[in-house]
Amino acid sequence: MSEQKAFSLKIDEQNIAWLAIDVPNEKMNTLQAAFADEMKEIFAQLKDTSGVKGMVIHSLKPDNFVAGADVRMLEACTTASEAEALAKQGQELFQQLSDLPYPVVAAIHGPCLGGGLELALACDYRVCTDSDKTRLGLPEVQLGLLPGSGGTQRLPRLIGLLPSLDLILTGKQLRAKKAKKLGVVDACVPETVLLDIAKMHVEKGKKKGKQKQSTKEKLMSGSGLGRKFVFEQAAKKTNEKTRGNYPATVAILEVIQHGLEKGFAQGQELEAKRFGELVMSSESKALRSIFFATTEMKKENGAEAEPTAVNKVGVLGGGLMGAGISHVSVAKAKVPVRIKDVSNDGVLNALNYNYKLFEKQRKRRIISKAGLQSKMLQLSGGIDFTSFNHIDVVIEAVFEDLDLKQAMVADIEANAKPETIFATNTSSLPIHKIAEKAERPENIVGLHYFSPVEKMPLVEVIPHETTSEETISTVVALAKKQGKTPIVVKDKAGFYVNRILAPYMNEAAHILLANEPIEQLDGALLDFGFPVGPITLLDEVGVDIGAKIMPILVNELGERFKGPDVFDTLLNDGRKGRKTGKGFYTYKGKKKEVDKSVYKLLNLTPESKLSDNDIALRCVLPMLNEAVRCLDDGIIRSPRDGDIGAIFGIGFPPFLGGPFCYMDQFGLKELVEKMNEFASKYGDRYAPCDGLLTRAGEGRNFYD
């Protein structure tokens, strides 16, 4: 029996070639270096076949075209030149495709991303289905890379400079209709006629000529002055977002500009060279490690048992968290939701919140008006427990009050099925205390979402000692269907994310009270790579929330969690943060500025004394120390979970790979030295924990 191949070629009776892609034993088609020989054989076969009128490239997978290059092959590269050779191989194969003397059409259904889109761009025409599964894009930048098989050169020549920069610099994915509007594809059709329409493009018998440039495009990319202006502005805007932490964006701008100025061939040459360099960069290695980790986690149940089916979800509480949880349950998990609140106003609030989110999608043409109505019909609510006897999982999102949450457990046990799971969205209360009076404690688990629920990708799954394996695996499966990345953590104060966040925030408060200006403090952590600074974060989360959580951590975990006592002063002055329009900043619409009166309130005279690097390290090192304690205490199951939790839960800089990956890069011996230096200057709170000292002494890394 011959070995199954990824590419197969057939010539039909009308002399049209059909190149089918079907990577053996894989759910998704990905491009691999090993396929190069197959492609060379196919080109040789096409060359030896006379009378071919054209070719259609299509996938035999039911729901994807080509999801990109197989990222795993980059891990085998030990030098930049090896990675550069991979890029050149892809460029050469796609150039051969582009040089065929007859029209070639890509028939696209499902994801067409990265190398998949680069393959399609090398064709004369692209036809895609109007399915919601169809997505087109070049997401390489999200892995710290650039498109390495001609994408940086072909896309700007196809759709123009500005839209290409937007797509390649962000890695955003286009839906089918948007791709048609931008000119990425030539037709957007129902799936049933995809191959017929692709064949029609071949039957036209013409290769696609050079794209005609609009006057605007000629001014922007065709003239030296216009091009210079566009790239200067793009570099400025990109640097504002990345703070110089992502070398891939700099390389993307350089390579596209070089190609437009020096020609396609030289553009591809630089593209391959920069691709090779980026593959070996620490930033790309860290981002790829996150990609591999999340891919791995998608396959895990979180427990030994298989999950049970969840056909209906109940949500207790119609506030911000309850509304967000109900939204991801309907929109992503596609299960009907029943909302219960103490008042009809609470239920209406949750329904209105959902309507606004779906209406945004309708305006962006992501869903139709009928689709919006269909989604809203999946939501219902009331002030009693009507229909809760049909619910599989109840997610509680009421106030942080132990008695109230225990009462909710009793209500659900009285009104739902015996096997109904009770998942509590608490951020500070112990799960075992919430389950203390339960008749069926094995059904109770923590499910800690982050706000806003519809945007934040992480959820902490917190079993207590008697939570069943089936309960754990079921809520892990539900969280994944809601579009979340779940990590299973131990039932201890602060769980994982809040526990490592607390010392970071405390240190920011220490630095502020030493008279460092708020702007510099926040700016230093932005430059380090966090999405927001610590003072802004406190305003966003709410000063009142911080005031509730910190004493719990001090009580449960000890004096090292005791920070400067500023909460009462701020709250007595009505400063709860963004939600009240006043915290450390004042807020008017989307604009914010430092409220200078807060300095007087706290008896401060702001003066910049510390370097940005020292500010950042002073905040980050206590977080790293606590992350190690969490690992050694069994709060998290692995360094991988700790890295993903910190990146997705609090925005730890992705290009650093997470706390544990960053510590390995920093060097544990060097880290211990830095902590000891800070401990001598600022106090014992910087003293490295035992786990860090042991590993540093033994020369071990977290990812050995």
From Swiss-Prot:
What is the name attached to this protein's record?
Answer: Fatty acid oxidation complex subunit alpha
Compartments, as annotated in UniProt: Cytoplasm
UniProt keyword list: Cytoplasm, Fatty acid metabolism, Isomerase, Lipid degradation, Lipid metabolism, Lyase, Multifunctional enzyme, NAD, Oxidoreductase
Write down the PROSITE patterns for this protein, in alphabetical order: 3HCDH, ENOYL_COA_HYDRATASE
Q: Which domain of life is it from?
A: Bacteria
Q: Which organism is it from?
A: Vibrio campbellii (strain ATCC BAA-1116)
One of the entry's Gene Ontology molecular-function terms is:
long-chain-3-hydroxyacyl-CoA dehydrogenase activity
Q: In which pathway does it act?
A: Lipid metabolism; fatty acid beta-oxidation
Q: Where is this region: Enoyl-CoA hydratase?
A: 1-190
